[in-house]
Amino acid sequence: MHLELRHHAGGMPVLCVHRCVIVICVHGVVCFVNIFSADRVFLVVQMSIHPFVGFADGASRSTRNLSSAAWVIYDPAGELINLQGVCLGRTTNNIAEYSAVLELLTEAVNLGIRELLVYLDSQLVVLQLNGHSSVRNPSILHLYLRIRLLERNFDYITYQHIPRHLNTLTDAVANLVLERHLRNL
């Protein structure tokens, strides 16, 4: 995965993440996020009121029942300001997905972020966090309620589903964390 910051016509900085995301900024405010693969643009989001963008992902290895969580935050200038991952130990993939959102929101609060657009590749988590599906699992409900408490720190927060192949940076970090942990066992 490679990151680079380019300046295009009009001096607009564009953060290029190979085969993942382009964030275009005008006067320090994120205007568009283009998620793409090869030559096809899959998603264009107008974001004049959402200066910060976060991506979250959980990963698990069924053979070892190990899971990890990863999250990425871009600032209003389109700069990658936070990229982290953590091994969660033995847990389920759904708990890993929720843990990634929880860690992302915790970091955003610590950074003083008040408006956030969150992208996830887990449709179930997006449906539940947007109130379109209920949470029944007690372990997940605990994480869900912690996320709801953290949301009180934001003036605006929303969750959007993206296909798995468009969440490549956080997926790569989550899998790298798992691989490093497995090598150290």
Enumerate the predicted regions with their spans.
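RNase H-like nuclease fold core
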Residues: 45-95, 103-114
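Short, low-complexity intrinsically disordered segments enriched in A/P/G/S/L with frequent Arg
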Residues: 6, 12-13
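RNase H catalytic domain
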Residues: 59-63, 102-174, 180-182
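Residues forming the Rossmann-fold NAD(P)(H) cofactor-binding site
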Residues: 98
